[in-house]
């Protein structure tokens, strides 16, 4: 097991500044090359403290921003234009990135596509819902309509 420091949020592991133990291969082949983590050392322990202090300072304002964005997202129905056939069947599927770009096109701000959780595969036009994880305490249910482009 390797002891590492996360440099950014990794789903299932933790957020930036957390010290976690992972298997050597996962750290060496996935986390380190993508810049998600650095090896743990005593000197890096001091970096962790500064990251955590900065995160705590941002936490309060980001919570308020996330709640404001969640209120906007739940009150708006997004439109996702996709290529579809005559009967409404899509050529492909709607992905989390499509929802994130629809939020940006609607002028509501930008969100990371990794924070969008689609509960089902979308293969036809219609109205659907997704969950957007804006903050660890704030989730927004987003309603969107898939329309032919």
Swiss-Prot record:
GO terms for biological process: translation. Keywords: Ribonucleoprotein, Ribosomal protein, RNA-binding, rRNA-binding. InterPro entries: Ribosomal_bL9, Ribosomal_bL9/RNase_H1_N, Ribosomal_bL9_bac/chp, Ribosomal_bL9_C, Ribosomal_bL9_C_sf, Ribosomal_bL9_N, Ribosomal_bL9_N_sf. Signal peptide: none annotated. One of its GO terms (cellular component) is ribonucleoprotein complex. GO terms for molecular function: rRNA binding; structural constituent of ribosome. Belongs to the bacterial ribosomal protein bL9 family. Binds to the 23S rRNA. This is Large ribosomal subunit protein bL9.
């Amino acid at each position: 097991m390797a002891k590492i420091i996360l440099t950014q949020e990794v789903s299932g592991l933790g957020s930036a500044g957390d010290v976690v133990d992972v298997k050597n291969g996962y750290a060496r082949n996935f986390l380190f090359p993508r810049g998600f983590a650095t090896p743990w050392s005593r000197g890096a322990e001091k970096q962790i403290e500064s990251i955590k202090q900065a995160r705590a300072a941002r936490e309060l304002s980001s919570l308020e921003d996330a709640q404001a964005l969640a209120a906007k997202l739940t009150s708006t129905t997004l439109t996702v234009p996709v290529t579809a056939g005559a009967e409404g069947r899509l050529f492909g599927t709607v992905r989390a990135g499509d929802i994130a770009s629809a939020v940006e096109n609607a002028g509501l701000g930008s969100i990371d596509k990794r924070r969008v959780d689609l509960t089902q595969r979308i293969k036809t036009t219609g109205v659907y819902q997704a969950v957007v994880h804006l903050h660890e305490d704030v989730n927004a249910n987003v309603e969107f309509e898939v329309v032919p482009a």
